[in-house]
Amino acid sequence: MAVKASGFIGKSAISVHLDFSSFPVKFSCLKQFSVSSPKPLVVLSVALSSPARTVESPPVGYRKNVGICLVSPCRKIFTASKIHIPDTWQMPQGGADEGEDLRNAAFRELREETGVTSAEFIAEIPNWLTYDFPREVKDKLNRKWRTSYKGQAQKWFLFKFTGKEEEINLLGDGTAKPEFKVWSWMLPEQVIEHAVYFKRPVYEHVIKQFNPYFVDEEKDSMNSSKD
């Protein structure tokens, strides 16, 4: 497979030709900024496909984190777009405090980021999943947190949304700064497709592990009524 792309960095025109016919790759979404943007144009982002890393406990140098997969009765997953990175969609996640029960931390993060309290715990993935920060992300986050993390080690939890959509509020519960600008229910494969490339292996693993629990209750109810 060959890919051609062109664009500008500052006032300079660039052209890129990439040939990936000899090995498999995954492409992230194309991102484009205006020429006047202080940030350089990102023409193409390519990530080699690799499985998520699973560990029994968080490795040294990785931030302890919880991830929340919130599924609706019709088998769709809650995702939201970050305020400052509008092209990036993700499931809720956040840091766990020292000594905090991880399931409680997941409930807390869900409430803080989405306002959701009507959620039923379904399952958790027993092992931790890790991902490394890309260099530019690592530098930015470590300046923000005043840390030196390599990446994040995540414990993932599955919850079923049992409330009404009016409950979802991206201002959260008021205890933390809002992180998301817009939200959507997505099919499992869409969640993976719209994830930022360095989180994608983790998302693939999470959805594979939770897939047996993804039941379309509305469809099952209709089928039962026909029997």
From Swiss-Prot:
Protein name: Nudix hydrolase 27, chloroplastic
CDD domains per the UniProt record, alphabetical: NUDIX_Ap4A_hydrolase_plant_like (cd03671)
PANTHER family referenced in this protein's UniProt entry, alphabetically: NUDIX HYDROLASE 27, CHLOROPLASTIC, UDP/ADP-SUGAR PYROPHOSPHATASE
Positions contributing to Mn(2+) binding: 109, 113
Tissue localization of expression: Expressed in roots, leaves, stems and inflorescences.
Changes seen on gene knockout: No visible phenotype under normal growth conditions.
GO molecular function, one term: bis(5'-adenosyl)-pentaphosphatase activity
A GO-annotated cellular component: chloroplast
InterPro entries: Nudix_hydrolase, NUDIX_hydrolase-like_dom_sf, NUDIX_hydrolase_CS, NUDIX_hydrolase_dom, RppH
EC number: 3.6.1.-
Stated family: Belongs to the Nudix hydrolase family.
Location(s) in or outside the cell: Plastid, Chloroplast
